[in-house]
Amino acid sequence: MKKLFEKVDQYIAKLLGVEDPALKSTQKTMKHTTMGFANVTANQGKFLQVLARSVQAKKILELGTLGGYSTIWIARALPLDGQLITLELEQVNADIARKNIIKAGLDPMVDIRVGKAIDLLPILEAEDAGPFDFIFIDADKPPYAEYFEWALKLSRPGTIIVADNVIRDGKVLDKSSKDEKVQGVQRFNKMLAENKQVTATIIQTVGSKDHDGMAIAVVNQATTLPIKGSL
């Protein structure tokens, strides 16, 4: 028997997270990636697309391509002259993603870079690829804090930064956790809370992907005043 949150997830997906043939085809190919169906859900993909549209993003950076499912959702927020750069560790995943992105008709605006994100980010800085209007972090968890620091370097005031999987099924509550992934997001969450360059929050996500969360941050304007009671 399906749980209530699963039924609600499906209800929302049928209303607002409808997959077209390209997304359905991409979803089927995820089983061939190195992480299986670890991609975002349709509802989460639509949520990311809405956020990217809200800032009228023309330049988007994604850390963690996998099979290109989230890439397609987010890239569809771009204007025709927009660009999305996505970083993927595994060549096999990048190859799958490239085929899916071509099928979706987004190949001209999507640039897939293969390698360790922590090595590719300095290259983007050297290329003066930024600033990006929207940044989505969904890569390996241990260096999430470092990814966030790089996201800030490659952003501008008003940039939205989103990081996925920051609750880890509630395991972030365990301060003595020895899990490197949990420790990575714990470091990230603490850094997010303490950083004065952004206004941020974390939203719990409950649905077909069970219990997790997304961090959402907006890079502050230089003149942004602290919210009363936040000091």
Residue ranges and their predicted role:
Residues 1-136, 141-162, 166-231:
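A short alpha-helical cap/connector motif
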